[in-house]
């Protein structure tokens, strides 16, 4: 692990692109260079994975505008009583879930809005799985996602894939830099990062 550099507290607001303000937040976070870690708690309807609690830590890479997390929950129960399985419920360690984001960085305050496209990146040799390109296309078609934001998002998404997942031209047996080394120091910080804020759904 690289030597610890000075870190800065940061407040994070989270939502989907086009959501009205205020978004969910402010969430306690810590900045380390181009990476930010922040946390929030899930409600009791979410059952945590073995050895985990309902406190979800998420990382932002501000250079490419993506958020990544290993989901802390095993399954959730809806208000109607239906069971929703989490990511990789049959695996000891879930794949990382990576979201394309629109990030507004104001220094001590960061606004992160979900831009629909996701990829699941396992660390056990399984292949990646790209998700929700249809939702991205629907948002453009419906007028909810302006063309300039869509173009910028796709360019940043390709840069994320090329930098962190598959840097070489041809496929390799391992990811280029995933989980990113940039989050190592943040991942080692004890929880909670600050006052716990619970997501109410």
Pin down the residues of each PLM region.
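Intrinsically disordered terminal and processing segments
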Residues: 36, 41, 46-54, 60, ...
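A long amphipathic alpha-helix within ATP-dependent nucleotide-binding catalytic cores
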Residues: 98-101, 105, 110, 154-156, ...
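A hydrophobic, small-residue-rich beta->alpha segment in the mid-to-C-terminal subdomain
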Residues: 115-163
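A short local loop/turn or secondary-structure capping micro-motif enriched for an aromatic residue
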Residues: 45-48, 106, 136-140
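Charge-rich, low-complexity N-terminal segments
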Residues: 1-56
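Well-ordered beta-strand positions
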Residues: 28-31, 60, 120-121
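Cysteine/selenocysteine-centered motifs that mediate thiol-based redox chemistry or coordinate metal-sulfur cofactors
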Residues: 156-201
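Structured beta-strand/loop patches that form or line metal/cofactor-binding pockets in enzymes
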Residues: 60-117
């Amino acid at each position: 692990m690289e030597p610890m550099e000075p870190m800065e507290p940061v407040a994070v607001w989270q939502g989907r692109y086009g959501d009205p303000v205020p978004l969910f937040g402010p969430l306690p976070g810590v900045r380390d260079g181009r990476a930010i870690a922040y946390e929030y708690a899930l409600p009791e309807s979410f059952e945590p994975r073995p050895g985990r609690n309902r406190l979800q830590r998420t990382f932002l890479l501000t250079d490419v505008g993506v958020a990544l997390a290993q989901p802390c929950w095993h399954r959730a129960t809806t208000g109607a009583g239906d069971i929703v399985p989490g990511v990789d419920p049959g695996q000891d360690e879930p794949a990382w879930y990576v979201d394309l984001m629109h990030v507004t960085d104001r220094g001590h305050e960061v606004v992160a809005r979900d831009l629909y496209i996701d990829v699941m990146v396992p660390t056990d040799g399984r292949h990646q799985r790209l998700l929700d390109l249809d939702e991205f296309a629907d948002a453009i078609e419906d007028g909810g996602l302006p063309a300039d934001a869509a173009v910028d998002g796709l360019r940043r998404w390709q840069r994320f894939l090329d930098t962190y997942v598959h840097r070489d031209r041809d496929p390799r047996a391992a990811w280029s830099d995933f989980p990113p080394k940039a989050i190592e120091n943040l991942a080692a910080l004890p929880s909670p990062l600050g006052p716990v804020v619970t997501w109410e759904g």
